[in-house]
Amino acid sequence: MTQDCDALILGGGLNGPALALALAQAGLRVALVDALPEAVRADEAFDGRAYALALASQRLLKALGVWQRVAGLAQPILGVKASDGRVGQGPAPFFLQFDDGEIEEGPMGFMLEDRHLRRAFFDAMAAEPNITQVSGETVIAQTPDASGITVRLASGRTLSARLLIGCDGRRSGTAERAGIKRTGWGYGQTALVCAIAHEQPHNGIAQQFFTPGGPLAILPLPDNRSAIVWSEADATAKTISALDDEA
């Protein structure tokens, strides 16, 4: 049986495209199925989400040809400061601090907004002849056979491959259809995510406060902006989310 591709990846977040590029650059024919339409995945509208990328992650993106597309949009992390604290009372007087002078390779990491990284992955895959992107489609069935596996999409289209890879998140339909069991639990916390602009420079320092309700991270972005990740107990986070701008 002739396969449509060597590897079929389900999931278009970050892991799926990264793996697709790595396999394609190794000479394999890859198809990636993404439930989101192209216009949504490639949209660069501001949504407040950002990633802290370790130096190893930045090197991986560079090797895949993705970093070159976003290097000018990333904020180097030049230091990390961590302390205990309480919201409204500020940090404790004792803290841990690390700076990039302690490593030889360069910055400790980089902050990069999700909207830019998503678009960079999308464009890099579009430029790779060994990758076929199938957007706005969901898988409803997967059937293994002697030569590989065949999946059926909601549109009725079928795709076959030697290998099926699930990169479709923690509630993976790929894993569920394969009968792979997962164990999980909740922490009773919700993360509130946003970005702010401020007058004083952050100097590339990432701040982390460990509060009774959960950690509060203030992470540097370009142009005197910072990404906020505030974890609180579910009930408290729900109350905060319901507040209006005046509050």
What are these regions (language model features)?
Residues 24-49:
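Glycine-rich FAD pyrophosphate-binding loop
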Residues 11, 34, 81-84, 196:
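Short beta-strand/turn micro-motifs composed of small residues
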Residues 5-32:
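N-terminal Rossmann-like FAD-binding beta1-loop-alpha1 element of flavoenzymes
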Residues 15, 38, 171:
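Conserved Rossmann-like nucleotide-cofactor binding loop
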Residues 22, 120, 124, 195:
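Rossmann-fold NAD(P)-dependent oxidoreductase module
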Residues 61, 150, 167-247:
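Conserved FAD-binding catalytic core of PHBH/FMO-like flavoproteins
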Residues 45-87:
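N-terminal FAD cofactor-binding segment of flavoenzymes
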Residues 4, 73-177, 185-190, 245:
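Conserved N-terminal helical subregion
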